[in-house]
Amino acid sequence: SQSEIPKIDIGEHCYNPYLCGFYNYCRKHIPENSIFDLSGVQLATKYDMYRKGIVSLNEVTDEIRLPRNAKIQIEVFKNGKNLIDKDAIKEFLQGINYPLYFMDFETFQPAIPMFDNSRPYMQIPFQYSLHYKENKNSPLQHYEFLAEAKGDPRIPFIEKLLKDTSHIGDILVYNKSFEITRLKEISEVFPEYKLQIEKLIGRIKDLIVPFQKKYYYTNEMKGSYSIKYVLPALVPELNYDALAISEGGLASLTFESLYEEKDDNVINEKRQQLLEYCKMDTFAMVKILEKLESIQ
């Protein structure tokens, strides 16, 4: 063993064959808002800049070839002004039709398959939240489902979902590839629901688009279009801080733990925490859409 830390600078080797345990320690000299925060830029490009002495976003010049989104990120950081493309946002909103659902799924991934027609680490949906608005000014309604931790949750999940989305209207999600993939997996395993699921998929619209395409971008988003960054940037008064469960990974682990849990009080408490978390996800989408609709 060595008594001194080797004098090796950070580089691509920090990630190979996996992320080094000293990753954060060795990056203490990297400032906030650095080139490593740039969205959609290859790691090799970032380290190429780093080796040339370019570390802060302030040091990135126009001559450096970068993707459009990264250039927007740098420009917003440098001039301190939010980017809001009103025409692009207006066009996006014209493609969304009321009545409108806001939908979010939660899944868990058992390493050892627990159910027929499943595979190791398959994402098994066990919960959804739906907010519903008949029109822009109508009161918000809420529907939800959380499976009992007894047996395969997929059939009760899809049956309740199809029932709860039976009104006409678009279905808004955040990052539609996740929900659509889960729905297609259910239709493959349970083909009796295939036609209904295909119709449901045809109604899905993606709220991620204005942020992914940088129609709306602020420095607080740190180059990300994840809802966990977009929400505090657009609706700072709304956050997950007060919730016992504040991210999807913990929701998965919490639900999976219920299969072994015998204490009814613990079960009820954890179920309530799961319901509150998933409800917050779709309520966040409601508030984000309201913010976009308020742009004149």
List each language-model region with its residue ranges.
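An acidic- and aromatic-residue-enriched active-site/binding cleft used to recognize and process polar
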Residues: 25, 105-108, 135, 176-178, ...
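Short helix/loop capping segments that flank catalytic or ligand/cofactor-binding pockets
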Residues: 29-30, 47, 58-59, 110-113
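N-terminal accessory regions of nucleic-acid-interacting proteins
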Residues: 38-100
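Conserved structured core elements
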Residues: 39-43, 99, 120-124, 148-159, ...
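Conserved RNase H-like, two-metal-ion catalytic cores of nucleic-acid enzymes
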Residues: 88-167
